């Protein structure tokens, strides 16, 4: 009986139910290009802002190509592990990063995963949707935690 129940639960809880699948088909119909272009514009601008502001402060960081994360390496940080470094950053700046070792990177390298999505995306999008370009004032208004966090990381890394 236990084995039968495990099989039943596996089929019930590991797949999306049929009603949800049908709803998704309806939700994905239509042209979503305006939304997607707006979201891509915001994420690209935010990622490049973080990159441009951190790369000049003894931080090795790859130019963003998409996604939601950057992996800065703090070359002047002297800790035994990236976990220890991330704890120090959190304690001293209030900025939360995940250690690179959590993602299979060498624990001795001072690499962390940084998410640049700490903002209300719906608000940001609705207020900038018709615009061709974004600027720092947009980040200060709609993503102030990003601007603040980058500033704190720059100060910490010096």
Where are these regions (language model features)?
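PLP-dependent class I/II
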Residues: 1-158
